[in-house]
């Protein structure tokens, strides 16, 4: 007899993503959407500097993609342990914390290079990456907190560092994408096969695919518009 099939509690617990906890922890389907929205913000800023954009992506990769997600896996051990029973929680947590610190280090470098005001984004981003996954304070691990930590702040930071100023366009974009990532998060919640019916989870996965396709397409087109 084969191993029992576990119900999917996350939309990316499929295929190669569920083969290894370190690989799953990067949460690529969601992380690439985040990078797409960060790209949209950078390319719509009054100025566009490729080196600043690449540094922004590097800081986000360390802090939010590796750091926050690895910490989240260890903080949610009861949720993920059935899928990765041999995972080394201590090693994953340590890697997550170190990655957040690495992301903050890149952010500090950017601050001294371009604008000391960017340190505000670095400090807040580090705080969100470290404490959102462990649900402290409680208000942070809510839909508004998610929108702030994974949408509004990264988008506004990406917009600001390009021209070192914030205008109404940048603020409006950050608010819009902050709400958009909450919609994405709720669709991901609705894919939990332990909590919802097959029709519900199927439709939620379809909407997530459409959402990802839109994010990738918009981000790529706007990036090309700045590079060509």
Labelled PLM ranges:
Residues 1-23:
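Short, Lys/Arg-rich, polar N-terminal cytosolic tail immediately upstream
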Residues 41-54, 228:
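Short, hydrophobic transmembrane alpha-helix segments
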Residues 47, 147-191:
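Functional transmembrane core segments of multi-pass inner-membrane proteins
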Residues 23-39, 52-118, 198-222:
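Multi-pass membrane catalytic core of lipid/isoprenoid biosynthesis enzymes
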Residues 37, 103-106, 153-169, 216-228:
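Hydrophobic alpha-helical transmembrane segments in multi-pass integral membrane proteins
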Residues 89-162:
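Intramembrane alpha-helical segments
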Residues 54-62, 117-127, 168-180:
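Hydrophobic core segments of alpha-helical transmembrane domains in multi-pass membrane proteins
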Residues 68-83, 127-140, 186-194:
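C-terminal ends of transmembrane helices
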């Amino acid at each position: 007899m084969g191993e029992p099939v576990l119900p999917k509690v996350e939309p990316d617990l499929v295929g190669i993503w569920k083969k290894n906890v370190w690989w799953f922890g990067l949460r690529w389907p969601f992380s690439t959407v985040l990078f797409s929205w960060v790209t949209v913000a950078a390319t719509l800023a009054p100025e566009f500097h490729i080196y600043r954009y690449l540094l922004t992506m590097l800081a986000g990769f360390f802090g939010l993609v590796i750091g926050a997600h690895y910490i989240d896996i260890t903080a949610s051990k009861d949720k993920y342990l059935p899928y990765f029973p041999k995972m080394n929680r201590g090693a994953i947590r340590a890697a997550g914390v170190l990655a957040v610190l690495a992301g903050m280090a890149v952010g500090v470098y950017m601050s001294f290079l371009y604008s000391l005001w960017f340190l505000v984004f670095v400090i807040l981003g580090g705080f969100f990456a470290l404490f959102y996954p462990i649900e402290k304070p409680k208000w942070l691990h809510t839909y508004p907190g998610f929108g702030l930590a994974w949408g509004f702040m990264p988008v506004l930071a990406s917009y600001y560092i390009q021209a070192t100023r914030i205008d109404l366009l940048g603020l409006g974009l950050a608010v819009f994408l902050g709400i958009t990532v909450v919609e994405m998060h709720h669709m991901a919640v609705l894919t939990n096969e332990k909590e919802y019916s097959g029709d519900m989870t199927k439709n939620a996965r379809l909407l997530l695919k459409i959402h990802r396709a839109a994010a990738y397409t918009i981000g790529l087109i706007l990036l090309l518009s700045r590079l060509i």
